[in-house]
A protein has these predicted regions:
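Catalytic His-Asp segment of secreted/periplasmic serine-dependent ester chemistry enzymes
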Residues: 196-297
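Serine-esterase "nucleophile elbow" of acetyl-processing enzymes
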Residues: 39-93, 111-112, 140-147
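A structural motif corresponding to the C-terminal end of an alpha-helix
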Residues: 78-85, 172-189, 224-245
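Oxyanion-hole/transition-state-stabilizing segment in secreted/luminal serine hydrolases
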Residues: 55, 104-165, 197
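Short amphipathic alpha-helices and their capping/turn segments at secondary-structure boundaries
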Residues: 33-44, 103-122, 174-189, 291, ...
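Secretory targeting and sorting signals
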Residues: 1-38
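Charged, often glycine-rich, active-site loop that binds/positions anionic groups
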Residues: 94-111, 256-270
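Structural recognition of the beta-strand scaffold that forms the well-ordered cores
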Residues: 43-48, 52-53, 85-90, 119-124, ...
Length: 297
């Protein structure tokens, strides 16, 4: 359901960046007038990977083209809705290590955007760590094409190796990253989002042209995504971070659904330049979940 109109107490002032306001209005949000005696706006740091950056969604943030960051990503929608002062350092292909190390020359570690007086931090992270999840998507897509969509060639070849890598590497790295954020802003509200479903729960033969995953590998890839989200949830619980379950919300809005229903673009014949990533509607829904989970409405 759409975000409710912001109350004046929360909509303290319109974000000064015109792109953020324009993007939010395009997604159906309205900006409330500034109260006569507004208090200081929330100080909001947005961290994370391409799902937070909205890589592939227009318009692109011109300040850092390497990160493929959109000014219509969910952090901008949240900021425009709440009147928060946003520092957006989300970046496509980011891994947990990029919270404390420069991802690209000239791109500071993401945790540098978090300060002791930061009020709000949001992020998605973990999907790119060691290439585990993205490698699984690519591997399963390749195997699906080669098998003509039959069987479970990806599961047969890789078994539990992807899940094992999440347990051994991604999960502890997530805890380290979240602890680093919490240490820098101990009083901030910190929320990490789970990843939305890419595939439906069961194979849909009509979707193979858009998402060439073999019928037996659709539940396999879905199970892997469940495992990744469970790791994110556990890391959140162990670090005092709010976990926002976006997978549950995205049920029925996977990459196999038609335009206007899907929140994730398919591997082929999608409407975004970056496949298997949230579209503008998906980013809007992510913003709604953040607002509701953190009581920002």
């Amino acid at each position: 359901m759409p975000l409710p109109a912001p109350r004046p107490a929360l909509r303290r002032r319109v974000l000064t960046a015109a792109s953020a306001v324009t993007g939010a209005l395009a997604l159906g949000l309205t900006a409330a007038p500034t109260p006569a005696h507004a208090t200081a706006p929330l100080k909001y740091a947005a961290l994370g990977d391409s799902y937070s950056a909205a890589s592939g969604v227009l318009p692109v943030d011109p300040t850092n083209l390497l990160c493929l960051r959109s000014t219509a990503n969910y952090p901008h929608v949240v900021a425009a809705h709440t009147g928060a002062r946003l520092t957006d350092v989300t970046c496509g292909a980011a891994q947990t290590k990029d919270f404390t190390h420069a991802q690209y020359p000239g791109v500071a570690p993401q945790a540098d955007a978090v300060a002791p007086d930061t009020d709000l931090v949001t992020l998605t992270i973990g999907g790119n760590d060691n290439g585990t999840f993205i490698n699984a998507v690519v591997a399963c897509g390749t195997a699906g094409v080669l098998s003509g969509g039959a069987g479970s060639p990806c599961k047969d070849k890789y078994g539990t190796s992807f899940e094992d890598a999440i347990d051994a590497n991604t999960y502890p790295a997530l805890k380290t990253a979240l602890r680093a954020v919490r240490a820098k802003a101990p009083d901030a509200r910190v929320a990490v989002l789970g990843y939305p479903w890419i595939t439906p729960a069961t194979a849909d033969p009509s979707c193979f042209a858009k998402l060439p995953i073999a019928s037996g590998d659709v539940p396999y890839l879905r199970s892997l995504q469940t495992h990744l989200n469970a790791a994110v949830r556990r890391a959140a619980e162990e670090t005092g971070t709010t976990y926002v379950d976006f997978a549950e919300a995205s049920e029925g809005h996977d990459a196999c659904e038609p335009v206007g229903t899907r929140w994730i673009e398919p591997l082929l014949f999608g409407s975004n330049i970056v496949p298997v990533h949230p579209n503008a509607l998906g980013e809007q829904r992510m913003a709604e979940r953040v607002v509701n989970a953190l009581g920002l409405d």
